């Protein structure tokens, strides 16, 4: 109904009643949109009431996440996986390639080199495990990006998937920390075992030297007694 306090609104109302909002030359759509009363309540001028493009944001996020994954994959290939493979080859063929080279070195130096290679191998293993879990975590965290398109803009399902992904990501992160702790524990055990083996080798080498020196002394004593007896026999015959 027309309102006496709002003359501009009354003008629009009259035009609407006449049915000449778009046809009357005295009034145009621009005047209708620029009207302060209509502008305040119009869906054309309020951004919050406009039709939102629901596919723009997920597509942009998907593209950004794909770029992030490509960058991480390249970093993993050139900075993690290739050095790890080379380290494994070095570690498994360590004695074959470097046994002769390290034969003349001190046992302490050899033990230090072996320990460094072992620690580096386990560090690279931990990095690969943690990186793999990080990729899985990233995939679960990005589930909410794909949820609207899969659920056809069903907000309930999207929130459920996002919440589940959040807890799964936390669980994966905790599992990665547990694996890291176990690997470090195994590393400590192997270092201790390697130290014991080097100690046993040193003790066995010392025992071998002692065993080889004792028969030599017995032989020299036997030779001396034989020489003395032969001298006595010669003197008696004379």
UniProtKB/Swiss-Prot annotation:
KW Repeat (keyword) present: no
Transmembrane feature ranges: 75-95, 116-136, 172-192
Major location category of this protein: membrane
Compartments (UniProt record): Membrane
Basic and acidic residues composition bias: residue spans: 229-238
Entry membrane topology: Multi-pass membrane protein
Bias (Polar residues): 206-220
Domain of life: Eukaryota
Alphabetical UniProt keywords: Membrane, Transmembrane, Transmembrane helix
UniProt-annotated stretches for the region Disordered: 200-238
One Gene Ontology cellular component annotation held by this UniProt entry: membrane
Name by which UniProt lists this protein: Uncharacterized membrane protein C1682.06
């Amino acid at each position: 109904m027309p309102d006496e306090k709002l003359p501009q609104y009354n003008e629009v109302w009259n035009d609407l009643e006449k049915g000449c909002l778009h046809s009357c030359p005295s009034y145009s759509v621009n005047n209708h949109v620029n009207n302060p009363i209509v502008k305040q309540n119009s869906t054309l001028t309020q951004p919050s009431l406009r039709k939102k493009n629901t596919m723009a944001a997920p597509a942009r996020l998907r593209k950004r996440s794909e770029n992030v994954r490509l960058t991480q994959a390249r970093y993993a290939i050139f900075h993690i996986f290739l050095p790890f493979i080379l380290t494994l080859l070095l570690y498994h063929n360590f004695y074959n390639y470097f046994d002769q080279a390290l034969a003349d070195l001190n046992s302490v130096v050899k033990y230090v080199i072996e320990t460094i290679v072992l620690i580096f191998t386990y560090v690279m293993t931990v990095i690969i495990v943690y990186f793999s879990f990080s990729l899985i975590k990233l995939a679960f965290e990005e589930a909410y990006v794909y949820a609207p398109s899969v659920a056809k803009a069903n907000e309930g399902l999207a929130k459920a998937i996002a919440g589940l992904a959040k807890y799964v990501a936390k669980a994966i992160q905790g599992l990665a920390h547990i694996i890291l702790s176990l690997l470090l524990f195994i590393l400590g055990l192997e270092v201790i075992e390697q130290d014991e083996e080097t100690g046993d080798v040193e003790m066995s080498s010392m025992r071998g030297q002692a065993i080889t020196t004792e028969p030599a002394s017995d032989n020299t004593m036997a030779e001396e007694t034989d020489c003395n007896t032969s001298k006595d026999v010669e003197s008696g015959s004379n």
